[in-house]
Amino acid sequence: MVGPVRPQIVLFGSSIVQYSFTDRGWGATLADLYSRTADIILRGYAGWNSRFALKVLHQVFPKDAVIQPSLVIVYFGGNDSTHPHPSGHGPHVPLSEFIENMRKIGEHLLSLSDKTRVIFLTPPPMNEKQIEIVFGDAIKGRSNELCRPYAEELLNLCREINVKGIDIWTAIQQQDDWLNSCFTDGIHFTAKASEIVVKEILKVLRGADWKPSLYWKSLPVEFPFDFDAPNSISLHDLELTRNNHFESPHLVSLCEQELTRNEQLEPPHPVSLCDHELTRNEQLEPPHPVSLCDHELTQNEQLEPPQPTARL
């Protein structure tokens, strides 16, 4: 462990969380914003549903830990909401069980300490045609209409147990041309979708009446910018200026600013998460479409009972 101890912000969920540190992902952006004020801790598990999350909840978030997180941002539901397969296999979790699982997750997290705050993210929408193009028959049983009730009921649960809820399902669909601009493979986020998620999270943190505030502009900066002349420049002001594009609708979008700064171009066509991961690791693509589960199993050299639908 390194010191001094900072507030901990934990991201807990499935592939939307695990891959949030890829190119300009929402987790990476939060880590950038909180780089001198808090630690962003990733606990993402691609392929998981809320049922799996419950199995490890007390291991990931033990009640007897000396240091408890200040904030936990939780995402599950995209896999739970897939269409059930006749075999009974696959990631589907019935809506009533999903809500009960999320209730248990929320109540456990709130019990960790008086200062632990919780945000639930709803399942996002998806581009069904893009999923078909990218994955072919490898992924079946996913649609916006299947996601909708999971998102709606999760928001109802948030109000019931006093957890902040963010309606990602609606927020992304309010973006112009969201079907073409928000997904790499019909399911996982582009930089544009991640920007939407970050702005929604910051909106909640800015408006919450939590004491202390966990909004990035409110947390104290760790150590002065210059020990020899600590008053010569305000690091806080410097950081606010650099990151103010998250608050102002009149400035260039985060995506455009990042692309210009890094002289990178967005892929000319949607690419699957598998393609992205294999390219990043200089590996070869198999000659046929592979599911995210297949990719994860190969990567970790583990065996799983055959699943008719891929998990995300």
From Swiss-Prot:
SUPFAM superfamilies: SGNH hydrolase. Its main location: secreted. It is found in: Secreted. Keywords: Glycoprotein, Hydrolase, Lipid degradation, Lipid metabolism, Secreted, Signal. InterPro entries: GDSL, Iah1-like, SGNH_hydro_sf. It comes from the Eukaryota. Glycans are attached at N79. GO terms for biological process: lipid catabolic process. Belongs to the 'GDSL' lipolytic enzyme family. This is GDSL esterase/lipase At2g38180.
